[in-house]
A protein has these predicted regions:
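Bacterial Sec-dependent N-terminal signal peptides
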Residues: 1-24, 270
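Subset of outer-membrane beta-barrel
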Residues: 20-331
Length: 331
């Protein structure tokens, strides 16, 4: 009952919080992909319940005994020479108290040249951000439902300005072992700034995601379907390149349809041989494709692909994600 009560309180609070997307809130790095596997499957996956200890950074309900004593370290050369990495570790105290999880995300924005309002150089400065999370999950009674939560401590330093914050992720997952089907609902980054950059309090990038996945019966493929940013339906913005100008010079901007909005909330992913020592991964983000593609070129924006290899007790994963003709990332 206490779990259900907490769930109701959180969602009641969310209903009075304005939905936030990129550029509308602080600590945006909290929504960076947590692993190459996640990046390869389109950028967001909520339903992997296996050895993958980094999955719990996005959905704490997936913390399970298979993660016991698993350590993951990931590094990405991101856009604009930004470097970031994640690390995660899980430990099972005993089968009754189950498994605890610790996760870390760190972003280094590099060095910048500073200038004052008169164009006089003020030297170089740096920027970096980090988040440390502690998570735990447990089964709800004897049902097929599991509940988990992460508590995150956030620090950010941009030039001479710094900020600290605290947030929580709350996740639920339904696991049907007979059908090999999982469904998850996650509320991420529900929190506040404890100290601000310059006296003005900013909201955190609150996000509600829904994920589904299933292992096909006769084919070694697990499909993933994720609906992201459910807290805000009109997620798309008109593309100026698609505006129409009539003979009188009047301009009509692009109208974003219901179907277009629906697809921009959608991420698809498939994993071939997910339980073997070698597997292939492919993902597609409709939103990334629509927002970053160039109309006159076919550059496969939104597409990502990767591989996974296992050597004894060590796993290696690599992913390449397409953003635009000018920028792609490796993880």
């Amino acid at each position: 009952m206490r779990i259900v009560f907490t769930f109701i309180i959180v969602f009641s609070s969310i209903s009075i919080v304005q939905a936030q997307l990129g550029g509308e809130s602080t600590y945006q790095f909290l929504n960076l992909m947590s692993s190459p596997r996640q990046a390869a499957l389109g950028g967001k996956v909520l339903t992997n319940v296996d050895y993958d200890v980094t999955q719990a950074i996005y959905n704490p309900a997936t913390i399970n005994i298979e993660m016991d004593n698993q350590l993951a370290i990931n590094y990405s050369s991101y856009l604009g020479d930004i470097r970031y990495g994640t690390a995660a570790y899980a430990y099972t105290v005993d089968r009754r108290t189950q498994t605890f999880h610790v996760g870390m995300t760190y972003v280094d924005y590099g060095s910048f040249d500073g200038y004052d309002e008169n164009g006089v150089s003020t030297g170089t400065f740096t920027g970096n951000e980090a988040a440390l999370s502690v998570g735990y999950a447990r089964q709800i009674g004897y049902s097929d439902f599991y509940f988990g939560a992460n508590l995150k401590f956030i620090t950010s330093k941009l030039e001479q300005y710094s900020s600290f914050g605290i947030a929580t992720d709350i996740g639920f997952i339904y696991i049907n072992e007979y059908l090999d089907f999982n469904a998850a609902l996650v509320v991420r980054n529900f929190g506040t700034q404890l100290s601000t950059y310059a006296g003005m309090k900013e909201s955190l990038p609150l996000e509600i995601d829904l994920g589904l996945s299933q292992m096909l019966e006769n084919v070694p493929i697990r499909w993933h379907l994720t609906f992201e940013n459910l807290q805000k339906w009109p997620i798309s913005y008109p593309n100026p390149a698609r505006s129409i100008t009539d003979l009188n010079g009047n301009q009509t901007e692009e109208k974003v349809s219901f179907i277009s909005n629906l697809f921009r909330h959608t991420i698809l992913g498939v994993e071939l041989f997910p339980e073997k020592g070698f597997n292939l991964r492919l993902g597609y983000s409709f939103r990334r494709s629509q927002e970053l593609k160039i109309l006159e070129q076919r550059n496969f924006s939104g597409l990502s692909f990767g591989i996974g290899l296992k050597f004894n007790n060590i796993r290696f994963s690599y992913t390449h994600a397409r953003y635009s003709s000018a920028a792609n990332t490796s993880f």
